[in-house]
């Protein structure tokens, strides 16, 4: 099949799915909740109807076998009874009335019996969940058929993106940096030789079904206690799990299973990575937390060891990916640490799937002062000899005046889109409003739902 025919087929499938969704919405609007539930059970792809039919066939065969076993007498009696009943009904009512009436009655009993059976089961499986079992099944099937998405990054930007993406696919692999050496993660790294769990903790919380409660629990920091003060519960939980399972990779996988996480969260490497940066004024700064505090323009960034070994599961996920997303997050301390791993660079460069970089909305003091969009792309190009992106997603409209004023006081400004310089790099530009403002704090962040919607729309058009 040619590329144009393939795109036409994809377009036709998208239109069909859209029409199916619209029909479903119309049915939902004009039917009662109970009838609407029955319609949902008839939806394709649930793997329920086929087993109901097989059960009915099996039950019929059981009665037939029993009848044969007892020398066919029951079949004769049943046939005679059915014949007399049908004769009575056709004498009482015309066949074009009695036939559909009995058919409808039979269907009613089938649906009623099955719905009560499922209801009894769901009361046990989901005693405190208001969501219908059929809705859970529909969502499960839809998400499991979603695209295989690999997201590379770290920090709050990555967890923000995952909150939106998890509504489009359950086949998400988040590749997370392990270069953090500040705060609770840094203490665990120094005192216990533990790889920093902070970013992994945030991503697991973002992908969980009970996201709000789990995030609050994982973010909870102990305020007192020898050795506990300043540590977050999530970091200690992951540390304990790593002690039990043997390493951070197995700890992340185990936590994901325990907490019903959609997708996987993997550390980029299990090596003890330490970042370093060479500033334009000649200074050499070592340590992830020290780089932004150096308050200078970064000329070059690297890590020790020079060539960390990538996790095999990470390389496998990139190879199997349908879609690769880089960012958002701190350019030098959250995104590039992953791309400094040679095997990850090579795997992304070889990928023949759509690859997009999400540019930050604002510049970051100490890391990307006065950076344009093309400067972000140049920084990525400097750590890799091959192209790692096909497009860049840029916020369309600037923040409001109060937000700009607040950020300007911190020496932070909107990232300027130097369109021509980006085009000269052979990079496509995706402009969209993916930002949200906090009216109280005047902070800007990527909006999880808008961001995910724009990214999946762009992917669908490739």
Curated annotation (Swiss-Prot):
InterPro entries: CofD (IPR002882), CofD-like_dom_sf (IPR038136), Gluconeogen_factor (IPR010119). The keyword Cytoplasm applies. CDD domains: YvcK_like. The keyword Cell membrane does not apply. It comes from the Bacteria. Residues 1-15 have a biased composition (Basic residues). One of its GO terms (molecular function) is LPPG:FO 2-phospho-L-lactate transferase activity. One of its GO terms (biological process) is regulation of cell shape. It is found in: Cytoplasm. Keywords: Cytoplasm. Pfam families: CofD. Belongs to the gluconeogenesis factor family. This is Putative gluconeogenesis factor. It comes from Synechocystis sp. (strain ATCC 27184 / PCC 6803 / Kazusa). The lineage of its organism: Bacteria, Bacillati, Cyanobacteriota, Cyanophyceae, Synechococcales.
């Amino acid at each position: 099949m040619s590329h144009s025919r393939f795109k036409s087929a994809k377009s036709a499938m998208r239109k069909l799915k859209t029409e199916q969704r619209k029909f479903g919405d119309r049915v939902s609007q004009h039917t009662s909740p109970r009838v609407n539930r029955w319609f949902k059970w008839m939806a394709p792809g649930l793997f329920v109807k086929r087993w109901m039919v097989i059960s009915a066939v099996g039950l019929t065969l059981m009665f037939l076998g029993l009848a044969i076993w007892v020398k066919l007498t029951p079949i004769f009696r049943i046939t005679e009874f059915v014949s007399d009943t049908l004769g009575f009904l056709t004498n009482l009512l015309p066949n074009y009335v009695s036939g559909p009436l009995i058919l409808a009655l039979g269907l009613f009993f089938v649906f009623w019996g099955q719905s009560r059976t499922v209801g009894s089961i769901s009361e046990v499986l989901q005693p405190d969940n208001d969501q219908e079992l059929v809705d859970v099944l529909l969502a499960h099937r839809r998400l499991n058929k979603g695209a295989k998405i690999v997201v590379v990054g770290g920090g709050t930007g990555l967890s923000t993106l995952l909150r939106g993406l998890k509504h489009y696919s359950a086949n998400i692999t988040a590749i997370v940096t392990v270069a953090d050496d500040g705060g609770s993660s840094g203490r665990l790294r120094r005192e216990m030789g533990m790889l920093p769990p902070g970013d992994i903790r945030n991503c697991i919380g973002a992908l969980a079904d009970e996201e709000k409660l789990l995030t609050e629990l994982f973010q909870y920091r102990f305020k007192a206690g020898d050795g506990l003060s300043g540590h977050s519960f999530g970091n200690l939980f992951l540390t304990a799990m790593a002690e039990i399972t043997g390493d951070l990779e197995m700890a992340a996988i185990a936590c994901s299973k325990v907490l019903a996480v959609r997708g996987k969260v993997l550390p980029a490497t299990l090596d003890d990575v330490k970042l370093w940066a060479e500033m334009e004024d000649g200074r050499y700064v070592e340590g992830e937390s020290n780089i932004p505090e150096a308050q200078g323009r970064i000329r070059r960034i690297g890590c020790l060891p020079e060539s960390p070994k990538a996790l095999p599961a990470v390389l496998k996920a990139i190879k199997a990916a349908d879609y690769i997303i880089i960012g958002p997050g701190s350019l030098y301390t959250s995104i590039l640490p992953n791309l400094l791993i040679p095997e990850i660079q090579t795997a992304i460069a070889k990928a023949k799937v759509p690859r997009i970089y999400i540019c930050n909305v604002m510049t970051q003091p100490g890391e990307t002062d006065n950076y344009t969009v093309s400067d972000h792309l140049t920084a990525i190009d400097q750590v890799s000899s091959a192209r790692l992106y096909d497009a860049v997603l840029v916020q369309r409209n600037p923040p409001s005046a109060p937000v700009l004023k607040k950020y300007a006081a911190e020496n932070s400004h909107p990232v300027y889109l130097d369109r021509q310089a980006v085009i000269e790099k052979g990079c496509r530009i995706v402009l969209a409003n993916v930002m949200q403002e906090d009216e109280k704090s005047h902070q800007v962040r990527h909006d999880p739902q808008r961001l995910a919607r724009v990214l999946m729309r762009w992917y669908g058009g490739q």
